[in-house]
Amino acid sequence: MAKRIAVCVGLLAVLTAAAPAVAQAQSAQAVLQAAAKAMGTNTLRCATYTGTGYVGIVGQNYDIRDDWARVELASYTRTINFDQKSAREERVIRQGSNPPRGGGGIPIQGDQRQIQLVSDRFAWNVNPANMLPVPQPQAAELRQLDLWLNPHGFIKAAMAPGANPVLITRYESGALGALVSTVQRKLNIISFTALGKYRVNGTINDQNLVERVQTLVPNPVRGDMNQEGEYTQWRDVNGVKFPGNFHHHTDWDDETQAPNYNGGHNSLTFTVKDLRINDCGEPIAVPDAVRTATIPPVQVQTTKLADGVYYLAGGSHHSVAVEFRDFTAVVEAPQDERRVLAVVEAVYKVIPNKPIRYVVNSHHHFDHLGGVRAMFHEGATVMTHRTNREFYKQEVLTYAPRTLEPDRLSLYPPTEFAEGYQLETVDIRGTISDGTRNLDVYYVQGSPHAEGMLMAYLPREKILIEADIYNPPAPDAQMPATPPPAAVNLMNNIQAYKLDVQTIAPLHGRVVPFAEFLKFIGKSGS
């Protein structure tokens, strides 16, 4: 009898413990159903919306403390087909009245048309010049995720079988312009896991409208990086409520809080001008070239520029290795860990048995910073401009867990580095030397591309190493009618520092004689 009582008590405890979870699940479904009814989500199969606004180019701010470099979104059209799990996005960007400072192709020359598509697990771009598909297998997962980060997509995904949404309620106050509001609103937060790993949170207000959708996405520099959309100015079209304004943050919107090491956060704002509901058109067909595409392997092509100096190309971003008596220095650790581990392997092949003691980081743009953590884990001291010190030390070179795409530094953190060996900063000039060879590092003053830009110079070999300032065009390309401001600025710095340059080893493009650079900027002679 005692045993039966114990079993009954145990079963009662299990049922009692399970009851709140069941109630919570039912509450989550009730909130979702109310939102779906209010928004007309159940009748929405597809939507096409057009508008204008601006784009913030993520990871390309001029100063690390600035917001993302901004360009005008002259036109934007997106069609989402929720049943097909597909989307087509076409936009035209131009420089507009935005300051021509920062990366990502700034200053934009004329209008640039961009076309991006996703269908289920396939992603591709379309080249506007010939309308041929360009496979983007590395972008497929995040583009698929993005289908569910808008209000209707969120509701559909959260209500899908197996989503297992949970509900929490909280009071929130928000920012009003630059001021923090003290008005608190009670809001419902629905949370579920998308694509097996992305925690997606939707904020539903007292009108049963989804006003915010937030998740984290992997980034080589930031790790688990905030991605969120805020939705306002709702309108009713054929019984479907749809936001008239989209505002997206990529990275945390913490501009009112100090310290703020990275100012970038506003990545997209546009106002909807036209909206078509359930006018789905023809289904998107996945091209054969896209279906068979795979992520290409990393290739590193090594070219000897001089004794102990190696150009490490083979992709869109390059590095340069310089051999010293008992160590090696590498200029640039770009893109991501995958690229840089291949670079490290290539360095040890041509310069064996010497550790990589330094990595020179040209600037803070994410495509040139993404592999710094891998070099740091390898044991290299990072040399960068002093402007970047706090951001790198506090937010980049950390051992914090990375849950979405763990890297070596987060998985296998090294013993704490001695003070001073994590970062070495440059103000105007720094030098890496073993007493017989110098690698001089200079601050590029007045660069329109990035504040804190560095370039490297080998005085004995007369080789200049630079990133994003001068990207040599093809040998048969026509010279620009007006030289780009960044290239002119490079020449000004070469003259100011009295550098005797014979060869430029750019970190994009190809190695060129200095005379070719002079021709590019409309000068002749030496």
Stretch-by-stretch model annotation:
Residues 8-18:
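Bacterial N-terminal signal peptides
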Residues 37, 41-131, 166-178, 337:
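N-terminal mature ectodomain segment of secretory-pathway/periplasmic proteins
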Residues 179-286, 454-459, 466-467, 472-473, ...:
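Gly/Pro-enriched, hydrophobic low-complexity segments
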Residues 262-325:
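Zn-dependent metallo-beta-lactamase
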Residues 303-349, 453-472:
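Conserved beta-strand hairpin/beta-sheet module of binuclear metal-dependent hydrolase folds
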Residues 338-383, 425, 496-502:
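Active-site metal-binding motif and surrounding structural segment of the metallo-beta-lactamase
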Residues 491-526:
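Divalent-metal (often Zn2+) His-rich catalytic cores of metallo-beta-lactamase-fold enzymes
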